[in-house]
Each structure stands twice: as C-alpha cells, then as structure tokens.
C-alpha cells in the first residue's frame, strides 16, 4: 500500500543520523559484520549495536534483522532505536520486513508508542506490518488500540491472518468482552482458521476467562489434535471456575493421552483436592508428580503439602516437606504458612522456630496464623518477639496488629498503632486505613470510626463502607446504619461482594431492618441474586428469627450449592424446626450435593434437639464410612451431649473408648454432670478425677 508524503514522514521519524563516529577505522563491511556477530554470539547485544552505530557504512539486511530480534529478546529499546537510526541513515527506503521487525522489537520492549508511530510513518505496509503493530498493542495491554487497528485493517482490505487474530484474542482476554469474543470466534471460522490449534486454544482460554465453560468445553472438543497447551488451559479454567471434579477428570484424560501437564497445572489440581478434601485423589496426583519428577518444584511441593494439611494428614505433610531437597526461604515460609492458615498454629510455630532464616513475610505469616485462629494471647507474645527480633515492619504487619486490637477490644492499643501509622505514612494505604476503621468499629468507638471515615474520603472504597456499616449496626443503631447505606449508594454502587458482606454482618449482630433494606435494594436495582447472596440472606433471616423469610428465599433458588444447604439446615436448628433437617438432608442427597462437616454438625444438633440417639450415632458413623469425612472435635462433642442429655451413659462409655483424642475440659464437665444426674458413679468418678488431673486416664 503506497502512502503519500514520504519525505515529510521520513523527516519526522526516520531521522538520518550522519554523525556516526568512525571509531572502528576504515575496515570493510565484512570486518564490521564479523565483530557484530562475535558480540551477538557472546550475548553482548549492546556492544554489537555500538559497533554497528559506529560504522560509516550499512550492513546486510539479514544482520539488521538479527539485531532487531536480539534487541527484542533482551528488551533493549535504546539499542533497537540505534539499529533503526543506522538502517534509515544508509537506506532511505528500508524494506518493509525490517521495519516490521523494528515494530516487533518496540512491542517486546514495552514501547508501544514507538511501535505505533513507526507503523504510521511507514511509506508502505504489508500484512506483517499490521500483525506486528496489533501484536505490540496486545502485548502491552492497549486493548482499545488493538481493536481499532483490527477494524482499520479490515476497512483497508487487508486480510487478517492467524497472527492478527491471536493478538486480538489476547486483548479480548484482558477486557473479557463475551459479545466481542463470539464475533471473533465467528470470524476465525469464516476466515478458515478453525483448524489452527493455537487460535482454538486461545478461544477456549478466553471463553473460560469469561466464565462460559460450556462454550469453552465445546470449542475444546472440536479441536482435532489438542496440544499440550490446550489440555493445560482447559484444566486450569475448570479449576478457576471451581469445577474441581471436571478439572480432575480432564487432568487424568490428558495423562492417558501421554500429555505432560505443566507444573502449574499439577499444583492447581492438587489445590482442587485440598479444597474438596479429596485425599485419595490427592495421593494419586502426588504419585504422578513424583513420577514426572516435578515434585521438587517449590510450587508443586507446596501444593502437595497443603493438600495433606487440609486433609488432616499432618505426618504425610511433614514428610513431604522434609523430603524436599532444596528448601529455600520461600519453601519454609510456604510450609509454615500452610500450617498457620489451616489453624495449626502449634505445628506452624514449630517450623517457624526451625527456619534457618526469616524475612518479614515469614513473621507476618506466623502472626496471621495466630490472628486467624483467634489466639490473641499468643499473638501478643509473638508481637513482643517481633519487636525484639526485627527492626522494620510493613503494611501487612500493621493490618494484623489492628486485627489483634479488634480481637481483644483494646482501643488504646489501636490508637497507639494509629499514631505509628500516621507518623510513618501508612495512613495512605487503603488496606491499612480500612483495617483501622474496622478496628474502631469492632471496639465500639463509633466517634473515632466516623472521624477516621471522613478523613479517608479520597481513599475509601466498598470495604470502608462495609466496616462503617457493620460497626454502626453492631451497636444496635439500625437507623443510622440505614442512613449510611443510603449514603453509600450515592457515592458508589455496592457490589455483590459488598452486599453479601453486609448481609453477613446483619446476621451476626443481628440487624433485621438493615438486612431487609439490603434485600429490598437488591430487588429494586435488579441485582441477580446468586447463590452467595442467597446464602447470606438465608443466614441473615435465620439468625434474625424470621425463618419463614429464610425458607422462601431458599425455595426461590434455581440452583443450590452446599453453602446454601448448610445455611438452611443450621437455620432449622436455630429456629426450633429441627424435624425439617432430616427431610432437607434427603433432598440434599437427591440433588447430588455432597455434605461436609458443617452439614453433619447441623444434623447432629437436630438429633440432640429431637432426642434421636441411635439416629445420631448412625449419622456420625456414616461421616467416615459413607462420606469419607473425618469427624472433628465438634462432632464428638455433639455425640457426647446427645448421650449425656438423654442418659445413654452405657453407650457413652463405649463411645469414649473409640475417641481418638483426650476429652477436653468442656466434654469432661458435661460427662461429670450427666453422671451425677443419672447416678452413674463409675464413669462419673473417672470424669471427676480426670478434671482434677493433668494426665490421661482410660475410661472405665
């Protein structure tokens, strides 16, 4: 395509630099070429470009191309500009393919403006020029320019190639425009590129990012010979959507076809097993990771460790960690953090104390573990140790400190932290600012909360409004909370996350009027009430003793996940309608939903209220035998309460012999009280003696 105004164009961009210093003498072109190649082969691109720039004569076109590619691979934009300058100095009308390489180099170097300017100044362009500038814009996230260039290319009658579509699809994956994606998909088919595996894989990837897994799977199934990348993409997108079962199935299919999974894919599938507590599947994937020799990878070994921790196989988890050959600081921190975030603070602290070196991330992870476990005394002791051992803290440390202040309701300590935050400039960090607001709200100092909320006017976001609203509602000021909620709607439209968080806050307070106002707002503003919000609404109405409303919200759900089922089951127990729990559990099973430990906690509580002793033991036994769920302390506590409440002390004695741990104080107190009530002296004497001693005694 010819472009007029060639002279003016070259005058602006293709600046001919005729001041190249002759520092290499008057050697021949062959000598210059040899020197450049020697530097390139030695990996010194800058010296190679310096030799070129000092040369008073041009080199071969193939050498210019190689220099552009070398600048691209090392992201050397200054050197790329020098190569272009030398090229146009000695070649007033450079060949198009070399200018295309220059555009590619600028794109790889992150200088998309240089790439676009060079493209506009080109006297002639071909399809490669369009591909180069579209790819450069896509690589640098300039999505609007990608689509503008693509439309302009079509208007100019240039046929889009696979490379053009690849760049446009990459940008579509950034903006997640489903309508545009469908148009591009149709265009790919129309242009006859539907057999291109890379393009089809990109389409699968973007459909997955747009959360339309049905279309992603359909396109994947249409790929005649999916590549390794195709398989890894579909597995990862399933995992990101939470479709863990489908992801695991596809993972094993790719293994059957001898497709090697990426390390990241292995770790992601392992994390899916962690989320669903699928121990046996996790063990198989662990064995596969060993066979593929990827278990030494830090990301993979950390995910294996995390799976065993989540599935309560602490010995296996520790074995994985101990067998990791090259344990760096990141490995130690990841393992320790895995324990800490799972509530296993004792095990986490053991690893922390063994760490050969620590950084602020390690300290923060341990402190965060204490905060998550609500172990406030340990957190305070650890803060004292931090003050002695390290000099500098960061914004994460401050957030945990403010959480500790909230947990122990120590507003004076919180104000001291506020002073430190102000003096060191952390008050401009929105996360720290929100944690500070949350601390004032949870400590009940609403005046300080209101003052700080007004001061952070330029910082505040949805989290800020959440903290203020829940803080006001927590002290029973529902009318003020409603007023703030109206103010929030003026400043920013609340997201589903915000509304779900507010509903959860209303449930915990409880604040029925505010909860109803949020429900009404959802309906009036046309929000799609998904399972997350619906679950929060059911929980809110249940805890606010409006269970009929909770039932209606539950029945209106088109689909019900486990969280929603657990909410309604707990609500039945809380509102004196325990008989309905057993019917709900049957419906849950009929819908193919797998119960978890929370579900069984609700069922056992219903058995306590209804006096179903034998049925309670059947449900308790089925946890491990039928559903492969390891009973937790809370489930054992429910069974002991069930036996004690209805005087089934003979069964209680048998049950105690099966318990895998020493009964804590609360259980022993309940057993002792029941034995006194029902005159069961032998077991009562054992419980009383156990309460008075620190060592373990076998039940009689």
Curated annotation (Swiss-Prot):
InterPro entries attached to this UniProt entry: Pentatricopeptide_rpt, PPR_At4g14850-like_plant, TPR-like_helical_dom_sf
Pfam families found in the cross-reference section: PPR, PPR_2
Coiled-coil ranges (or none): none
Intervals holding PPR repeats: 95-125, 126-160, 161-195, 196-226, 227-261, 262-296, 297-327, 328-362, 363-389, 394-428, 429-459, 461-495, 497-529, 530-560, 561-595, 596-626, 632-662
Keywords of the record: Repeat
Biological processes per GO annotation: RNA modification; root meristem growth
Record GO terms (molecular function): RNA binding
Protein family: Belongs to the PPR family. PCMP-A subfamily.
Name of the protein described by the UniProt record: Pentatricopeptide repeat-containing protein At3g26540
Organism: Arabidopsis thaliana
Gene giving rise to this polypeptide: PCMP-A5
């Amino acid at each position: 395509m010819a472009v007029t105004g060639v002279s003016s164009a070259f005058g602006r961009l293709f600046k001919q630099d005729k001041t190249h210093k002759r520092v290499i003498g008057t050697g021949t072109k062959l000598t210059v070429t040899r020197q450049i190649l020697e530097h390139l082969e030695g990996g010194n691109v800058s010296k190679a470009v310096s030799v070129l720039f000092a040369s008073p004569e041009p080199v071969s076109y193939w050498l210019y191309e190689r220099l552009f590619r070398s600048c691209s691979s090392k992201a050397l934009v200054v050197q790329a500009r020098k190569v272009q300058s030398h090229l146009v100095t000695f070649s007033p009308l450079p060949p198009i393919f070399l200018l295309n390489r220059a555009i590619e180099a600028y794109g790889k170097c992150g200088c998309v403006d240089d790439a676009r300017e060079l493209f506009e100044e080109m006297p002639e362009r071909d399809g490669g020029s369009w591909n180069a500038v579209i790819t450069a814009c896509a690589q640098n996230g300039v999505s609007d320019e990608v689509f503008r260039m693509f439309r302009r290319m079509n208007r100019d009658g240039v046929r889009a190639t696979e490379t053009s579509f690849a760049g446009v699809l990459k940008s579509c994956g950034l903006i997640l425009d489903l309508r545009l994606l469908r148009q591009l998909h149709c265009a790919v088919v129309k242009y006859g590129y539907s057999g291109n595996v890379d393009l089809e894989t990109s389409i699968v990837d973007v459909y997955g990012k747009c959360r339309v897994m049905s279309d992603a799977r359909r396109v994947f199934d249409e790929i005649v010979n999916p590549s390794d990348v195709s398989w890894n993409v579909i597995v990862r997108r399933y995992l990101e959507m939470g479709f863990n079962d489908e992801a695991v199935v596809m993972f094993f299919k790719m293994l059957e076809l001898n497709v090697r999974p990426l390390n990241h894919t292995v770790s992601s599938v392992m994390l899916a097993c962690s989320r669903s507590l699928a121990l046996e599947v996790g063990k198989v994937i662990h064995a596969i990771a060993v066979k593929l020799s990827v278990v030494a990878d830090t990301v993979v070994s950390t995910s294996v460790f995390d799976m065993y921790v989540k599935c309560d196989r602490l010995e296996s988890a520790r074995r994985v960690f101990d067998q990791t050959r090259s344990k760096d600081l990141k490995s130690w921190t990841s393992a320790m953090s895995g324990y800490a975030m799972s509530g296993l603070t004792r095990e986490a602290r053991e690893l922390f104390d063994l760490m050969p070196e620590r950084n602020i991330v390690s300290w923060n992870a341990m402190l965060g573990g204490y905060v998550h476990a609500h172990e406030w005394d340990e957190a305070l002791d650890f803060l004292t140790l931090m003050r002695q051992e390290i000099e500098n803290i960061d914004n994460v440390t401050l957030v945990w400190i403010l959480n500790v202040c909230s947990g122990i309701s120590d507003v004076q300590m919180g104000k001291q932290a506020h002073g430190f935050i102000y003096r060191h400039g952390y008050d401009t960090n929105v996360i720290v600012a929100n944690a500070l607001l949350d601390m004032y709200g949870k400590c009940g100092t609403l005046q300080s909360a209101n003052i700080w909320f007004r001061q952070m006017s330029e910082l505040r976001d949805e989290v800020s409004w959440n903290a203020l609203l829940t803080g006001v509602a927590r002290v029973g000021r529902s009318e003020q909370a409603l007023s703030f909620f109206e103010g929030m709607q003026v400043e920013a439209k609340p997201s589903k996350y915000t509304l779900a968080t507010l509903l959860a806050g209303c449930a915990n307070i409880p604040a029925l009027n505010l909860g109803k106002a949020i429900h009404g707002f959802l309906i009036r503003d046309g929000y799609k009430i998904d399972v997350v919000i619906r679950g929060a609404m059911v929980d809110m109405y249940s805890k606010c003793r409006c269970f009929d409303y909770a039932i209606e919200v539950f029945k209106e759900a088109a689909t019900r996940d486990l969280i929603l089922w657990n909410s309604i089951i707990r609500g039945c127990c809380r509102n004196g309608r325990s008989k309905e729990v057993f019917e709900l559990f049957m419906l849950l099973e009929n819908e193919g939903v797998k119960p978890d430990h929370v579900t069984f906690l609700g069922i056992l509580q219903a058995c306590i209220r209804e006096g179903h002793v034998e049925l309670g033991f059947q449900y308790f036994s089925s946890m491990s035998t039928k559903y492969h769920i390891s009973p937790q302390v809370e489930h054992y506590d429910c069974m002991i309460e069930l036996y004690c409440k209805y005087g089934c002390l003979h069964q209680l004695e048998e049950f105690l012999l099966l318990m895998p741990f020493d009964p804590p104080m609360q259980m022993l107190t309940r057993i002792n009280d029941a034995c006194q009530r029902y005159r069961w002296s032998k077991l009562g004497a054992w419980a009383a003696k156990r309460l008075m001693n620190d060592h373990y005694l076998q039940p009689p």
